[in-house]
Amino acid sequence: MLDICLLGTGGMMPLPYRRLTACMTRFNGHSLLIDCGEGTQVAIKERGWSVKPLDAICFTHFHADHVSGLPGLLLTLGNAERTEPLLIIGPRGVEKVVNSLRVIATELPFPIEFYELNEKEHVIQMDGYKIEAFHVKHNVPCYGYNVIIPRAGKFDPVKAKENEIPMKYWNRLQKGETVESEDGRVLTSNMILGEPRPGIKLTYCTDTRPVPAISEHAKNADLFICEGMYGEEGKEKKAREYKHMTFYEAAHLAKDADVKQMWLTHYSPSLVRAEEFMGKVKSIFPRAKAGKDGKTITLDFQEE
């Protein structure tokens, strides 16, 4: 199961009812944070979630509304006596940006490791899941992210016997381990399992124009969280000028990608009630919802 929470849905500046951009996931004792706007750690505490099992922080880009919550979060992790390394992923210059923000958090009891995004696509293998980063179109280097939990195929006893796999290795191979047998053979999970089954996929992108890379990478996502900076009529020119998206452009991306559902996020401060504009959005993509701070979902593997 993958737990997902929109911690903040605001763009540019926080409002009394809307914190700045951040999204958190939880899977099998591991947590991941995408962006860390002002108020992120307060939002985490409000949800009753914990920062302790945080594996990594993924930054889409380095505008202030996406990174301003980082120093306080790092200090909180330090005060919690964390010693495990923290991975921070982001576009070119990520180490320089983070170290600049750390001017008030210079001494931490844990090391920070950096993964710099400098290609159009990256795949980062984590413990039990993977992160895919893909380049999008903003006025600074910016990336969208997929969080993917793969699911192995079903155990196939006929295949196991055909490959002469001793029963004592079945359990370890089903867990994905590679085993050397007593006769020197290297045994792998594909020798006893069927074809991989559909896993769980979250796609997250914000601060971008609607480029083809988004719908390509969001294809068949279980949840597509996408920027909807403007819902009001007449904002199309502004969206093009500042490299953002309207609600309706996001809806077309969701339709093209055939995602299971879409949540809008990263609203302009001028947008007070996103729900008012959802009628037209749903006429394009019926499975769309207006995201709001604290909106949470648990995604599970599909029943077969």
Say what each PLM segment does.
Residues C5, I89, E113-N118, E132-F134, ...:
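General small-molecule cofactor/ligand-binding pocket signal
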Residues M1-R47, P85, Y145-V147, G194-C205, ...:
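Conserved beta-strand hairpin/beta-sheet module of binuclear metal-dependent hydrolase folds
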Residues G39-I89, E113-N118:
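Active-site metal-binding motif and surrounding structural segment of the metallo-beta-lactamase
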Residues G69-T76, V98-L101, V272-K280:
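Metal-dependent catalytic neighborhoods of phosphoester/phosphodiester hydrolases
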Residues E121, V211-E304:
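Binuclear metal-ion centers of metallo-dependent hydrolases, dominated by the metallo-beta-lactamase
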Residues I34-G37, L54-F62, G90-P91, L202-T208, ...:
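Active-site neighborhood of phospho(di)ester-bond hydrolases with catalytic His/Asp-centered motifs
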Residues L15, Y129-Y204, T208-H217, L223-I225:
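Active-site-proximal loop/helix segment associated with metal-binding centers of metalloenzymes
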Residues K96-A105, F114-E119:
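A gly/proline- and charged-residue-enriched helix-loop-helix capping module
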